[in-house]
């Protein structure tokens, strides 16, 4: 099947849904060492839902984000619907998300107050390779949750395309024992597959930040939060861009995919810089 894939259209979300269709086809017809069975969409089974009844919201039966800091949140927490609404700022993602994701597992950070999240938006989140379609995320901040949803969806997509966190079956050919600087986990070097995962997921986050700022009718609070998040994300994504550009090794398909990803990234980061500069948040690139 991979020979028929237009890898130049698989990096950024496509308006016609091409990348969504291919990702689902790969997820439902293939496996990986960490996902031994092909994906089968989980039924809603009466759970509360988002995205027009397509995405179930239910608490995780066991495991998940680590207690006591994190505790299960209500599946009807109002920030879930608020985050869904925020994704509408990026129409291609708003359409793609409920096709690739079937379950959101909500959590809360017990160490932070509601007032904290009003000034410092964010979310803790996680997803597992053997659970394609499931996202765990804290719901305390609507914009932070929206970021977490696209962040973890991007991880799921990249895994389905053949790039796991520590190894790859296609696209990336770097030796897993060779380590590089991650734009996110900065205290230790990581395999190139992990660096690409960090960059790919957070470019999605950064693109959402740009979309939230540029959205017609965006409130001043939404713009303020988007600027704050861009100031946090753009410099480290610029550093990650340089690390990947200098060191990634690919097969023929990966060369096309990475070129398309870097082209999209360049446009996202350029717009992010413009927004920061226009609002007095311009800071030196790392």
Show the residue positions of the predicted features:
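Short, charged/polar micro-motifs that form catalytic or ligand-binding hotspots
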Residues: 69-73, 135-148, 186-198
């Amino acid at each position: 099947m991979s020979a028929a894939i237009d890898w130049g259209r698989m990096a950024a979300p496509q308006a016609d849904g091409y990348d969504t269709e291919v990702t689902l086809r790969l997820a439902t017809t293939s496996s990986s060492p960490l996902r031994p069975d092909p994906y089968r969409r989980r039924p809603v089974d009466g759970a509360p839902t988002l995205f027009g009844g397509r995405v179930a919201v239910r608490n995780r039966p066991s495991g998940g984000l680590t207690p006591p800091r994190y505790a299960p949140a209500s599946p009807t927490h109002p920030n879930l619907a608020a985050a869904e609404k925020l994704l509408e700022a990026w129409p291609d993602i708003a359409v793609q998300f409920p096709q690739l994701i079937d379950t959101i597992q909500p959590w809360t950070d017990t160490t932070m107050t509601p007032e904290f999240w009003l000034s410092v938006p964010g979310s803790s989140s996680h997803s597992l390779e053997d659970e394609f379609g499931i996202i765990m995320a804290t719901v305390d901040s609507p914009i932070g949750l929206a970021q977490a949803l696209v962040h973890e969806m991007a991880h799921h997509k990249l895994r389905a395309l053949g790039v796991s966190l520590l190894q790859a079956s296609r696209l990336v050919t770097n030796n897993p024992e060779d380590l590089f600087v991650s734009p996110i986990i900065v205290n230790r070097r990581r395999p190139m597959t992990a660096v690409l995962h960090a960059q790919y997921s957070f470019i999605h986050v950064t693109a959402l930040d740009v979309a939230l700022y540029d959205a017609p009718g965006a409130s001043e609070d939404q713009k303020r939060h988007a600027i704050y998040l861009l100031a946090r994300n753009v410099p480290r994504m610029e550093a990650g861009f340089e690390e990947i550009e200098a060191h990634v090794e690919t097969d023929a398909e990966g060369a096309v995919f990475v070129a398309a990803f870097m082209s999209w990234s360049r446009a996202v980061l350029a717009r992010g810089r413009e927004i920061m500069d226009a609002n007095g948040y311009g800071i030196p690139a790392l």
